[in-house]
Every structure is written in C-alpha cells, then in structure tokens.
Amino acid sequence: WKGNEMSVQTIAVVGAMEQEIELLRESMANVKHVSFGKFSAYEGELAGKRMVLVLSGIGKVNAAVSTSWVIHQFAPDCVINTGSAGGLGKGLKVGDVVIGETVAHHDVDVTAFGYVWGQVPQLPAVFASDKNLICQAEKAAQVFEGAAVTQGLIVSGDRFVHSSEGVAEIRSHFLDVKAVEMEAAAIAQTCYQLEVPFVIIRAVSDSADEKADISFEEFL
C-alpha cells in the first residue's frame, strides 16, 4: 500500500465499545448491519469510501478475532483502531489524542527464552503503525480544539489499569510509554500477521490511577 489516498477504497474501523464507534456510524450513509457469531459490524459509505465499523468487544482476544474476521470478509485497504486509553505520557490530560506510532503487549512475558518483555516469540517486540496513516491521523486529529495530539508507544493488556502500582509496573518495562489500554496490540499483531496497514488512535479517558474508573465513565 503506497499511502495514496485515492487508492484507499475500503477502511475498517475497530472499536471495543458502542460509544467508540457510534459517531462514525451516525455519519455513514447506506448503513447495513452485519453480524458474525456474537460480533456486530456496520457497513456503509463515508466521504466516498466504503467503511466497515466493527464492534469488537473488550480485550485482546475479542480484538484479534474481530480484526481477523473483518480483514478476511471485507479485504480493507487499512485498519484503524479507535477508542479510549489511560494516559501515561508526561502532561497528557483527558481528551488528548495519542497516535500509536508503536504498539506492544504489556502482559506478555517470554523473557525466560531471551525475548524482551512484551514480545511474542518469533514476532517483533513492537508493532509499528503505517507511516502514511500516522500522517493522516495527525491531520485529522487537529479538529479537536484544545486537545494535544502526540505520537508514541501504546501498550495493551487484558486488565484495566487503575492504580499507581499498575502504572509503575508498566513504566518499569516501557519507559517511554504514552498510553495503556486493552486491544491495540492484538489488533496490531493481527494486521502485522495478515499484512494489512494499520494505525492506532486513542483519546485519553483517564490517568490509569486510582480515579481511573470514575474518569473513564465520565469520559464515555
């Protein structure tokens, strides 16, 4: 994929929760509801492109299954993962946007066999978002007035981080981490394995600390 906007005809957007995809769904024309097993997706048109919105559900397995399905079923030119995240980067506040330049699992440990923390055997230690898609995301995010837009490392794991101890543990493995959430690394790994360009875009909903659950609910 050369990053030529005209060549992109089909875009898949994966979101874990209804609140994370409903604005896009309301903006689409000719929307069709598609279900596969227990998963839901919406196919439609937006800005002259074919869009497929997938409601993945929460967590890495849900994210991987639904991303794999949408790639197999709709052959998208790229995959966008959108949603919320706990902000760990310095100075990040609720509403700021983090573009996942790189993405890693924070709860994978195969260090006994010489892999780095977070690395799945035989795979890269981090997965990189497509550079052209990062540029497009950076431009698109400028519409959020008052929100800072930053790029960096987003880490994922199957737990909602809501304590300073949890944050400290993640930082001990990933010094330059910007945000933490529960799906991005699985989506990135799926796209890497199936050779589809992707970008991860997350809005900060909380600071992954003791007030995270309250802040997260308010943000949604």
Where are these regions (language model features)?
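Regulatory input/activation interfaces that engage signals or partners
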Residues: 143, 198, 203-220
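Structural motif
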Residues: 77-80
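N-terminal short beta-loop-beta anion/metal-coordinating cradle
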Residues: 7-74
